[in-house]
Amino acid sequence: MPKLPFGSRSKVVLGLLAFFFQAACGQLEPLNLPSESAVPAEEAGPLSVVETVARQNWQIPLNTGRDALEWRLRAIDSAVGSLDLQTFLWLDDTVGNLFKERILKAADRGVKVRILIDDSFLAGQDQSSLRLGAHPNISYRVYNPYGRRSNSTVSRTVLNLGEFSRLDHRMHNKLMVADGHIAIIGGRNLADEYFGMDPQSNFRDMELLVGGPIISDLEASFDSYWNDRWAFPIEKLARLQTQNVSINEFAAKAKTASTEFPSETAAQQQSAWRNVAKESYRGRARLHVDAPPKDRPEAIADRPAQVANELERLIGDARSEVIAVSAYLIPTPTLTDVLRDAEARGVDVKLLTNSINSNNHLSAYAVYRNHIAELLNLGAEVHEVRADAKDRYRYIFAPVVEKKLGLHAKYLVVDRRKVFIGSANLDPRSLRINTEIGLLVDSPSLAKELIALTEVDFAPENAWRLENVDGSLVWSSADTRRQTSPAESGFQRLEAWFFAHLPIEAEM
């Protein structure tokens, strides 16, 4: 390789120094924008029929990706007045583009759309986001954005190194409200793998479709984030290269899913909403949501605590049983104490999380691995999802054989009557760093249904049960019993061992 002349090498060095100096010094400042509120509930349109069926709070579990996709699309297609969508991740894949296509159609009908998305996974998507937000009826905001934009996640991270503390705080909330009548709340992001459509690996997740008086609280939650000073209009962050926005752009990428989920007539929509409200579970509901930081997201005093406090209180008040499903399970010291106290009171604690092979974040599994013995010793029952679960076909579109299953759901069932479902995992990142949202429902019938839906996930053909035998961990399932983690390879175990020895637990 030829050497650069001294002058050229000097310019390269100076350029790199300037690059890193710029990355370390610049800071994005929050905005002051006029406050906006949710559009009042529509009195017309297919969604309004739910008010004639159920005036009290009602809930329906969205157990499978197909159910979740069908009801989301139906809500978007049924809206006539407003649509508010808050999410952590929205990928440019089949499902992601299907949502964009249907949202554009809604906007063309005159629906006022507000989209609020966290900036964690938006690298390379500024132009498609700008084209979506260019529609006169669509407002698109990015929460806690990276000030220096890039199409590469790596270069974007380097460019913004000086703001690591601020950018470490993320909005993990997931919520959709349509026409002020219904909402969807839970764990799903907007991408193929959350709806069973990824060709390689998909998630088992859980959400609630809800209606009733709680909708006004959910709208207020959305407004609080929408009006936060760290919610930036996308046009403040990047410049649109082409003004044309076309449904065809997104429809072409979503063709396969579009034929699977065709649009319905207004009469079909109204009938579907009437029936789901009639068949729903009824129960008192209370929203728990982390407040957006008052000043800068990195401020210790502003760290979210509302959802964490409620989760810990729920377990702390349990009298007989706690069933906790969490994609990532890394108990904080406070949560560990709460679980220990529950077991000491005679409460049965049953936990379901990812195994080494089903986890999409190996570092999270590695840190959790350090806590397994402690959880077992305090008396908890610990289960891990099998990536090759026999019943994974329930959550995955065909063909299933070559597809892996992972867990992404986040919910608790306490004493067979209280249900807490939302976006929060039982880990330090959800409990102490990110903002989260969750709905607490007091309903024995809903709890019974969720327990029935979850039983299949705990079954030995679908999950490993962990034991501590003479100081060694043992994984047991329907067809085998092993003393090493069920990794896909020895190298995966080596990677996990490496991560387990890094000082990263507080960030997981």
Which sequence ranges carry the predicted segments?
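Exposed boundary/loop context
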Residues: 8, 17-19, 180
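N-terminal Sec-pathway targeting helices
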Residues: 5-12
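Charged, low-complexity intrinsically disordered terminal segments
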Residues: 2-5, 25-174, 178-508
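Bacterial N-terminal signal peptides
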Residues: 13-23
